[in-house]
Structures are given as structure tokens and as C-alpha cells.
Amino acid sequence: MISTVALFWALCVVCIVNMARYFSSLRALLVVLRNCDPLLYQYVDGGGFFTSHGQPNKQVRLVWYIYAQRYRDHHDDEFIRRCERVRRQFILTSALCGLVVVSLIALMIWH
């Protein structure tokens, strides 16, 4: 029988790997954004996005831009594809993180 603790840690590893994939896709999206739409890149603080002095309110703008699917009217097809990918990965990573939290609570109650 599979240990529940081992299953929990496997779920944590899968969540961490998907987070890394999400951040990598977000970086690639910002590179494409810098080339195809410099004004939007500046609007979401693309240059300082992954730095300690980045502006969280501008970072949230990009998240809401993608969440609301406002990119669908953009002129660059590659940018639209990257936004779709980042959106799907964000939904997957959010669901996995939620599952990890629920699993942790269940593990604490069960053991």
C-alpha cells in the first residue's frame, strides 16, 4: 500500500515543478511582450517583474489582463498563444496548490 505521506510529498513535488513551468512561461511571455507591445510591457513593469523592487500592483495588472482574457484582441498571434499557455498553467498550478493545502489539512486530521 502506498504511504499517504509519500503521496503528499509527491503531490508537493508535482506542484513545485508546475510552479517552475509557470514562472518560466511567464518569463517567455514577458520577452515576447517586450518585442511586440513595448507600451503594455512598460504598463505591467516587465523589466522589474521578477526583481525585488518590482511593483506588485503592476504585476497584478498582468495577472488580471490574462485572467480576463483581454489579450484576445491583441495583434500578435504568438503573444496570444503565450497568454493562453500562461493562463492554463496558472489555473493548473492554482488547483494543485489548493489540492496540496487540502491534502495537508487532511493529513493533519488523519494522522
UniProtKB/Swiss-Prot annotation:
Major place of residence: membrane
Cytoplasmic compartment segments: 22-89
CC terms in the record's Gene Ontology section: plasma membrane
Keyword annotations: Cell inner membrane, Cell membrane, Membrane, Transmembrane, Transmembrane helix
Phenotype caused by lack of the gene: Cells are sensitive to exposure to ethanol but not heat in stationary phase.
Factors inducing expression: By growth arrest in general, by carbon, phosphate, and nitrogen starvation as well as osmotic shock and oxidative stress.
Residues in the signal sequence: none
Record topological domains on the Periplasmic side: 111
Annotated TM spans: 1-21, 90-110
Topology versus the membrane: Multi-pass membrane protein
Subcellular location: Cell inner membrane
One annotated GO biological process: DNA damage response
Superkingdom, natural source: Bacteria
UniProt cross-references to Pfam families, sorted A to Z: UspB
Other remarks in the entry: Overexpression of uspB causes cell death in stationary phase.
Family to which the UniProt record says this protein belongs: Belongs to the universal stress protein B family.
Name used for this protein in its record: Universal stress protein B
Organism: Escherichia coli (strain K12)
Source organism phylogeny: Bacteria, Pseudomonadati, Pseudomonadota, Gammaproteobacteria, Enterobacterales
Encoding gene (name): uspB
